[in-house]
Amino acid sequence: MEAPRPLHVLLVHVWYWPHVGGGNQHVEQIGRELVRRGHKVTVWCADVPAHEEKRFERGGVEVIRIPPSRVLNGVDPVVSIRGLNLSGVDVIHLHDTLPILIRRTLAKAKRAGKPVVTTFHNDYVKRTISGKLLKRVRWALQGRRTLHASDARIVLTPHFEGLLRKKGVRGDLDVIPNGFSPVEDSPVEPSALEGRDSSRPLLSFVGRLSEQKGVDVLMDAMDSYEGDPGFDLAIAGKGELSVWLEDRHGKANSKGIISVLGLVSDAEKRWLYENSTAVIIPSRFEGLPTVLLEAMNSGTPVVMADVNGLGGMVEQAGSGISVPREDYLSLASAMTEVAHADIETSSRWSSNGVATAQSYLWSSVTESVLGVYHRVVGD
């Protein structure tokens, strides 16, 4: 049987390196895996934050950063793609459904007769009445239309498959999870943790400092303890709540046992995974977070907020503890439980996590994505 031909794949996502986040890491890893398999990959993204180079190669992937005229509500860059063309592109893979860059690329692809694959990554939570109404209107007028106009649709979990059906999405949905690549850098202890009493359990948060990731819920949990909970907490990452966290940390009851590390290197992240008693993920909403997969692969138990079926996934895998979303008291209780679990329980969580993570390696995930590409191009 003849092997499928090499493809030129255009990946489109608002955010990309050097922006920090799970979505752009997802896109970058797919791109790198495709390049390793002999395919050509181009990325279109918004130039946010502004980067000196607008066109460059990273990991074998051609990156085109498009400067926006403005950014709507701080999350949707207004970009023009008139000067870009789709000549030679075999398939366009959109990562999201609503942003201007996504919808304009979809329209351009349809005019050019190019097949489009769209991945639905997440269902964002809105709290205000106006926000919920706007979300519903945008979904009906933009998000659902993006999916229906696509030649194939990918969701990360069975939970999102069910959600999109409830939202009125028709047609086939391919369930292909987020993936991860094991950190290859040798572990390096973050300098802020040097000299820490290593006999105390260490719990770690690794992620963007944002409302979505629940760092405020984590701090509420820490402040709920009347005394020393018997463990230390490391918070690694940066984001829109970095300044807020610095202030909150300074006022925290448990300030002395919390280390705010800022953005860490891959080597430091690996050290945290390998030396933490558990990784804490108190998110308000998620797709399938890379930190969850990386932690499990490292044999580190997790405490996962039960959002979009992820708590159930952790419980089914037997790799840690699930807690209700935004429930800081339940989170505090789970953190105490995981920090002081007996060796047998910790070992069981660890081994179950490692076994579960193997099916989420990028090599396996990309093979499934490639199958979708070849299907829509007719190979």
Predicted stretch roles:
Residues 284:
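Aromatic "clamp/platform" in nucleotide-sugar-dependent glycosyltransferases that forms part
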Residues 115, 125-145:
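Nucleotide-sugar donor phosphate/pyrophosphate-binding loop at the beta->alpha transition
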Residues 192-223, 318:
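Conserved donor-binding/catalytic core segment of Leloir-type glycosyltransferases
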Residues 246-264:
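Nucleotide-activated donor-binding/catalytic signature segment of Leloir-type glycosyltransferases, i.e.
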Residues 159, 179:
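Carbohydrate-associated surface elements
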Residues 263-264, 271-276:
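Short alpha-helical donor nucleotide-sugar binding micro-motif in glycosyltransferases
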Residues 301-305:
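Short hydrophobic beta-strand element within catalytic cores of glycosyltransferases
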